C-alpha cells in the first residue's frame, strides 16, 4: 500500500510544509497543489505545482504521476475558473487520461466522484475558508 500526503495553499507559511511531513513521516509521495509561495529548494521532496500566487516559482503548471494502477493529475484550481468549475476539472482530467485530480485554490476541502473521475481538494493548512478547518489529506492506494 502506498501513502500519498497532499496539501495546498500554505501561502508562505513554510513551517506548515515541514509540519505536515513531521505528522506524516511515512509518506511515499508528498504533493503540494500550489500556492506554497516557497522557494524550489524548500520543496525538493515534494511534487509541487505552481499556483496563482507562486509568481516567481519555476514549478510546473501541472504534474502527472502514477501510483499502482491510478493516474494522478495535480493542478492548482485557478486554472478551472469559477463558472462550471467541476465540468472544467473533469474535462481536464479526462484529456490527461488520469483518474484522480488533486487541486487547491479554494481553500475548502472537497472529495467528489463524478463520471468515473475523482476530484480532491485538500483544503488549506493555513487559511481555511467556507467554515472549514485547517486541513491536508492522506490517500492510501492499494495495489492489485
List the predicted regions and their residue ranges.
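Core catalytic region of metal-dependent phosphoesterases/phosphodiesterases
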Residues: 2-69
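Active-site-proximal beta-strand elements of phosphoester/diester hydrolases
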Residues: 3-11, 71-78, 118-123
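Active-site environment of divalent metal-dependent phosphoester hydrolases
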Residues: 11-16, 37-41, 53-58, 80-84, ...
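Binuclear metal-dependent phosphoesterase catalytic core
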Residues: 16-18, 67-68, 95-97, 120-144
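A short, flexible low-complexity segment enriched in Lys/Arg and Gly/Pro that occurs
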Residues: 27-30, 96-108
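Conserved beta-strand scaffold positions in the cores of enzyme catalytic domains, especially
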Residues: 46-48, 101, 119-121
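Helix-adjacent hinge/juxtasegments
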Residues: 49-52, 56-97
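Short beta-strand scaffold segments in enzyme catalytic cores
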Residues: 63, 110-112, 135-139
Amino acid at each position: 500500500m502506498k501513502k500519498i500526503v497532499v496539501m495546498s495553499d500554505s501561502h508562505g507559511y513554510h513551517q506548515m510544509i515541514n509540519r505536515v511531513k513531521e505528522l506524516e513521516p511515512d509518506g511515499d509521495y508528498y504533493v503540494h497543489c500550489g500556492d506554497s509561495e516557497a522557494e524550489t529548494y524548500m520543496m525538493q521532496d515534494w511534487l509541487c505545482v505552481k499556483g496563482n500566487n507562486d509568481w516567481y516559482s519555476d514549478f510546473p503548471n501541472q504534474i502527472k504521476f502514477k501510483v499502482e494502477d491510478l493516474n494522478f493529475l495535480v493542478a492548482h484550481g485557478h486554472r478551472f475558473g469559477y463558472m462550471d468549475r467541476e465540468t472544467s476539472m473533469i474535462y481536464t482530467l479526462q484529456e490527461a487520461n488520469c483518474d484522480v485530480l488533486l487541486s487547491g485554490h479554494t481553500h475548502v476541502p472537497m472529495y467528489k466522484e463524478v463520471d468515473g473521475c475523482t476530484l480532491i481538494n485538500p483544503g488549506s493548512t493555513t487559511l481555511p475558508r467556507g467554515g472549514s478547518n485547517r486541513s491536508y489529506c492522506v490517500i492510501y492506494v492499494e495495489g492489485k
